[in-house]
């Protein structure tokens, strides 16, 4: 049993996250002075999500009654997730699951089964190439991401492209269907088994029994970092 959810965090995590604990500490102190404050905060956040959902519903209702409904691709996503106290943290600015897990819904005429759900993690670099595919543009040689069209057609399709996120300089996380691997700029690491620990309570990075998994994920992240970018934005073409 751990004394706190930060007890098994490595030095890199503590350095990156320590100055972001003010929100959690402040909310904890407020809840002690005014019991129920934390519950009110969570309810307020849920209410904001509910309101946003209702407005999306209004847009979709309007689209359904328009002449372009059957020729429109709908994509719904968020730029980040949000902690509401998980890992003793509130807001985003982290490499853990809650900060990086976003809603991501794609609806395209004639593609996939309505209401189907895919459990395979992707990152948002799939968005552009997927839209190209859906629009009939097959040449994606200039895209850094991979089209998720195979997953739209079959949510259980083979997918060998782990989701990668970055926060701050040289702090990265890699997510597969089972594992979340985090590597900080100082080389320290976290490893979570989402099959048995979906809340990321226990950091397995220092356990001898998990070193094989850790090494594979470490190599996979390095492979992604070493890959040459498809488009060279450092050498823009002159405008004519």
Name what the model sees in each region.
Residues 63, 151-152, 205:
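Hydrophobic residues in alpha-helical segments
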Residues 61, 219-222:
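Surface-exposed alpha-helical segments enriched in charged/polar residues
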Residues 1-121, 134-142, 183, 200, ...:
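Active-site-proximal cap/lid insertion segments
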Residues 80-86, 112, 123-128, 132-194, ...:
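C-terminal cap/loop subdomain of S1 sulfatases and analogous C-terminal strand-loop tails that border
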